[in-house]
């Protein structure tokens, strides 16, 4: 029976290392795999530094990012851990969400304290909705002065509090990734302490299947004698036949109706689940009442909006993006889920223009409403070509 088998496997959590360049993010990632390999050899292969450092490139919404994916297990959990070698890769990953993080390990060198990129990563983590942070105070073996260590820890806590993380309460663990990698038992113990903090301070995320049903509509057609069918890939939740649904987005008004049947490859199903490509038969809905870009939802669980704040990354010319900057009142298309909607851009005060390769915040006003929530990802396009990527940080109206 599949269900019992699933409960036997460990809960899965996605995390990543963030922080300033050369503070030891990649060394720490390698050290975690080594220490966990030594502790639970049958569960964990060891991943050396140079394998993580030469991370393969992958594309997310047309943007190339170098990301290293590492897997490991503690006694309690199975982790997928992302580490990006370059600072630009981090920013791109966090904004495009190529690798989603349920929590992050913020690496700060005790020898330096928080640096500009430390601040930038924490700010971005807050903007893109990384919900929990655990701090690894790395290179602690190189600082003999206890007072200095306490001072650095205080600085990190204040930085996190300034971005609305619980800076006073979250775990800060003093580690030495290099010493742990060299096999020093005391520092290996500190790394196990860090992983225990990750196990206990980064809560289990809610699985997509447990959230309310949402399916973006990709296509609409009419089946003679049966009515209108909408197809798409269910993004989250579960839907059963004869449940009420709501159609949201693109039009001024949302429509409520009943889903009278669910099919896949012309077979009827008893439910549609997150991740499945399905057709939903809708009662009493005309073909012209629905279109691509709307979403089918559990009634009341998503609302249409036209105005929002966002954090975005604009592709460089080398990445196939624009060759020139854009200015106030720029009017590209914003691609949400399955459709493009034109929007007008207002840049933040003090920003006159945005260059290719920049990341920035902006306010956008769409010409049609989209079912929207905080953190929703989108691409910015011009004539079907991706020129940027972003996510909603705040809904205005």
Swiss-Prot record:
Keywords: Cytoplasm, Elongation factor, GTP-binding, Hydrolase, Magnesium, Metal-binding, Nucleotide-binding, Protein biosynthesis. It is found in: Cytoplasm. Residues 176-178 are annotated as: G5. Its EC number is 3.6.5.3. GTP binds at residues 19-26, 83-87, 138-141. It catalyses: GTP + H2O = GDP + phosphate + H(+). Residues 19-26 are annotated as: G1. InterPro entries: EF-Tu_GTP-bd (IPR041709), EF-Tu_GTPase (IPR050055), EFTu-like_2 (IPR004161), EFTU_2 (IPR033720), G_TR_CS (IPR031157), P-loop_NTPase (IPR027417), Small_GTP-bd (IPR005225), T_Tr_GTP-bd_dom (IPR000795). Pfam families: GTP_EFTU, GTP_EFTU_D2, GTP_EFTU_D3. Residues 10-206 form the tr-type G domain. Residues 83-86 are annotated as: G3. GO terms for molecular function: GTP binding; GTPase activity; translation elongation factor activity. Gene3D superfamilies: P-loop containing nucleotide triphosphate hydrolases, Translation factors. Residues 62-66 are annotated as: G2. Its main location: cytoplasm. It is an enzyme of class 3 (hydrolase). HAMAP family: EF_Tu_B. GTP hydrolase that promotes the GTP-dependent binding of aminoacyl-tRNA to the A-site of ribosomes during protein biosynthesis. Monomer. Belongs to the TRAFAC class translation factor GTPase superfamily. Classic translation factor GTPase family. EF-Tu/EF-1A subfamily. This is Elongation factor Tu. It comes from Salinispora tropica (strain ATCC BAA-916 / DSM 44818 / JCM 13857 / NBRC 105044 / CNB-440).
